[in-house]
UniProtKB/Swiss-Prot annotation:
Subunit structure: Homotrimer of disulfide-linked HA1-HA2.
Organism per entry: Influenza B virus (strain B/Paris/329/1990)
Glycan attachment residues as annotated in the record: N40, N74, N160, N181, N319, N348
Disulfide bonds: none
Subcellular location(s) per record: Virion membrane; Host apical cell membrane
Secretion signal, residue range per the UniProt entry: 1-15
GO cellular component: host cell plasma membrane; membrane; viral envelope; virion membrane
Keywords attached to this entry: Disulfide bond, Fusion of virus membrane with host endosomal membrane, Fusion of virus membrane with host membrane, Glycoprotein, Hemagglutinin, Host cell membrane, Host membrane, Host-virus interaction, Lipoprotein, Membrane, Palmitate, Signal, Transmembrane, Viral attachment to host cell, Viral envelope protein, Viral penetration into host cytoplasm, Virion, Virus entry into host cell
Protein name from the UniProt record: Hemagglutinin
Post-translational modifications reported in the UniProt record: In natural infection, inactive HA is matured into HA1 and HA2 outside the cell by one or more trypsin-like, arginine-specific endoprotease secreted by the bronchial epithelial cells. One identified protease that may be involved in this process is secreted in lungs by club cells. Palmitoylated.
Additional comment: Major glycoprotein, comprises over 80% of the envelope proteins present in virus particle. The extent of infection into host organism is determined by HA. Influenza viruses bud from the apical surface of polarized epithelial cells (e.g. bronchial epithelial cells) into lumen of lungs and are therefore usually pneumotropic. The reason is that HA is cleaved by tryptase clara which is restricted to lungs. However, HAs of H5 and H7 pantropic avian viruses subtypes can be cleaved by furin and subtilisin-type enzymes, allowing the virus to grow in other organs than lungs.
InterPro entries: Capsid_hemagglutn (IPR008980), Hemagglutn_HA1_a/b_dom_sf (IPR013828), Hemagglutn_influenz_A/B (IPR001364)
Protein task: Binds to sialic acid-containing receptors on the cell surface, bringing about the attachment of the virus particle to the cell. Plays a major role in the determination of host range restriction and virulence. Class I viral fusion protein. Responsible for penetration of the virus into the cell cytoplasm by mediating the fusion of the membrane of the endocytosed virus particle with the endosomal membrane. Low pH in endosomes induce an irreversible conformational change in HA2, releasing the fusion hydrophobic peptide. Several trimers are required to form a competent fusion pore.
Length: 362
């Protein structure tokens, strides 16, 4: 059998070119590679975004806490933390919390010497727990505490729900009940039991009252500075009261007060007892906070509007449109993009190849 060979001849002119291999049009996309530096590619997918500032929002898939007690109207977070009259209510559980007051504003009710203690940290301490509740029972009987019997002091600046005189539910203002025990006393000690459910932290609020010399004698029978100490969970704190030198001060339109109170708290771990050593003017602990779980806390602002994937301290609420972001680096919680210094691109095409030239026919 004879083989038949068919020859295909292509006749070209001097101006003709034949392009072979992969070709593409010119590309504006440039990517930075580890081995070849800048490389032109036929296509890229941007992986980064630069957010714009927005309002804070609820975190998708979880409850987000703004104010400690949303239904406690006209109450600061410190009012709620101290259980001021008319400022007690349910604190919703939350796995994420907005720290909207870096330095919580003052409580009303009675003039507090905030700068002597860490009391302004109390709302933010509570905010860091997922579950928070105020005990239904008092931790001790204040009327029969050492140095008593006591009557429980109230203030016209702290109206209760019936608009009578009241005081913070977390503390009892222990005033000697009769003239027989309105005298100076050596330091007295009371044990503060653990009354929360096992596994919860117990946050016990306490403090002391001081006034000018005349009022100290009238209330307590002693005008000298008084000493106070709290101890719990390996932390011991000492105070000496200041006598007099206070200008009259009214809180929230209440009655002017010549005295001041210093308020502090101690954290008692599960099953652990605390102690308070005191003299005259003690504000004995009553209802305590029982707290458990952890809530992720981020600095932000209120109100919370809508829902977002991520909460970012600098940008507010974000939806995750890209896996990475550029711009300001700050704390973020939720389903958040990762911060990178420079934009990232993913090459989804081929390396740009210029058209190949056909050798001219000789």
């Amino acid at each position: 059998m004879k083989a038949i060979i068919v020859l295909l001849m292509v006749v070209t002119s001097n101006a003709d070119r034949i392009c072979t291999g992969i070709t593409s049009s010119n590309s504006p996309h440039v990517v930075q590679t580890a081995t070849q530096g800048e490389v032109n590619v036929t296509g890229v997918i941007p992986l980064t975004t630069t957010p714009t500032k927005s309002h804070f929002a609820n975190l998708k898939g979880t409850k987000t806490r703004g104010k400690l007690c949303p239904k406690c109207l006209n109450c600061t977070d410190l009012d709620v933390a101290l259980a001021r009259p008319k400022c007690t209510g349910t604190i919703p559980s939350a796995k994420a919390s907005i720290l909207h007051e870096v330095k919580p504003v003052t409580s009303g009710c009675f003039p507090i010497m905030h700068d002597r203690t860490k009391i302004r940290q109390l709302p933010n301490l509570l905010r860091g727990y997922e579950h928070i509740r105020l005990s239904t029972h008092n931790v001790i009987n204040a009327e029969t505490a050492p140095g008593g019997p006591y009557k429980i002091g109230t203030s016209g600046s702290c109206p209760n729900v019936t608009n009578g005189n009241g005081f913070f539910a977390t503390m009892a203002w222990a005033v000697p009940k009769n003239d027989n025990n309105k005298t100076a006393t050596n330091p007295l000690t009371v044990e503060i039991p653990y009354i929360c459910t096992e596994g919860e932290d117990q946050i016990t609020v306490w403090g002391f009252h001081s006034d000018n010399e005349a009022q100290m004698v009238k209330l307590y029978g002693d005008s000298k500075p008084q000493k106070f100490t709290s101890s719990a969970n390996g932390v011991t704190t000492h105070y000496v009261s200041q006598i007099g030198g206070f200008p009259n001060q009214a809180e929230d339109g209440g009655l002017p007060q010549s005295g001041r109170i210093v308020v502090d708290y101690m954290v008692q771990k599960s099953g652990k007892t605390g102690t308070i050593t005191y003299q005259r003017g003690i504000l004995l602990p009553q209802k305590v906070w029982c707290a458990s779980g952890r809530s992720k806390v981020i600095k932000g602002s209120l109100p919370l509007i809508g829902e977002r994937d991520c909460l970012h301290e600098k940008y507010g609420g974000l939806n995750k449109s890209k896996p990475y972001y550029t711009g300001e680096h700050a704390k973020a919680i939720g389903n958040c993009p990762i911060w990178v210094k420079t934009p990232l691109k993913l090459a989804n095409g081929t390396k740009y190849r210029p058209p190949a030239k056909l050798l001219k026919e000789r």
